[in-house]
């Protein structure tokens, strides 16, 4: 794994020719769906074992403490309350492309939120469950809903289930965003991502270019 730290002000990448400076920027372009540099099967490292033919790009974001997000149809909540942050209190997103086929397509991509999450729900994280399933879990586990409980929101049921847990041990869990509420939540978080535009110095940039007109 290669980890690169950026600060919030200004960053410069310095290195000899062909040591991978452009690769870093192109990887960010791929992660942020910039479209300037397409990801191809040839980008997989040549010594990748047959059992692990994946390209993985992860980005970790600092999150404003106690910032509220509309993750649940108008009900504001925090990423802390949803247990979607990593052990350092950051939002960590990991994108994985399956390179076991002859080419990379849209179906090759899987996206995960890497969180410090309750071990008790690691196999089926609560943000991947529908509201009826969450309500059923509350009934099955004998969760006593407090007075004034607002049953309109999935986050209310998740919060009640988390508070009911006796074993609050946690571990790193990769939460897939491919189904149920997780997909909607990720779309809301995606809207908060910074704008990333890659301008290639070795080509002629024009005002009519797509990445200039629509960065």
Describe the predicted segments one by one.
Residues 25-89:
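Conserved P-loop NTP-binding catalytic core
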Residues 21:
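Conserved lysine of the Walker
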Residues 75-215:
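Electropositive, glycine-dotted interaction segments
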Residues 16:
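P-loop (Walker A) phosphate-binding loop of NTP-binding proteins
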Residues 2-8:
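Phosphate-binding P-loop
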Residues 13:
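Hydrophobic anchor at the beta1->P-loop junction of P-loop NTPases
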Residues 8, 61-65, 97-101:
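Beta-strand elements of well-folded, non-transmembrane domains
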Residues 9, 55-57, 195:
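Core residues of folded domains in eukaryotic genome-function proteins
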């Amino acid at each position: 794994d290669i980890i690169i730290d950026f600060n919030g002000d200004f960053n410069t990448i310095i290195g000899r020719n062909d040591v991978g400076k452009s690769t870093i920027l192109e990887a960010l372009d791929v992660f942020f769906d910039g479209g300037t540099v397409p990801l191809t099967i040839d980008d997989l490292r040549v010594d990748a074992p047959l059992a692990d033919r994946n390209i993985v790009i992860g980005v970790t974001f600092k999150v404003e403490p106690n910032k509220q997000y509309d993750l649940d149809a108008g009900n504001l909540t925090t990423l802390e309350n949803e247990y979607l942050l990593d052990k350092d209190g950051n939002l960590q997103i990991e994108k994985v492309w399956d390179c076991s086929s002859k080419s990379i397509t849209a179906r090759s991509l899987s996206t995960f939120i890497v969180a410090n999450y309750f071990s008790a729900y690691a196999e089926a994280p609560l943000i991947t469950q529908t509201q009826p399933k969450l309500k059923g879990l509350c009934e099955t586990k004998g969760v006593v809903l407090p007075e004034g409980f607002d049953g309109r929101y999935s986050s209310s049921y998740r919060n009640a289930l988390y508070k009911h847990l006796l074993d609050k041990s946690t571990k790193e869990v990769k939460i897939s965003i491919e189904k149920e509420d997780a997909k909607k939540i990720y779309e809301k978080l995606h809207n908060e991502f910074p704008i990333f535009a890659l301008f290639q110095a070795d080509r002629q940039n024009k005002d009519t270019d797509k990445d200039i007109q629509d960065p």
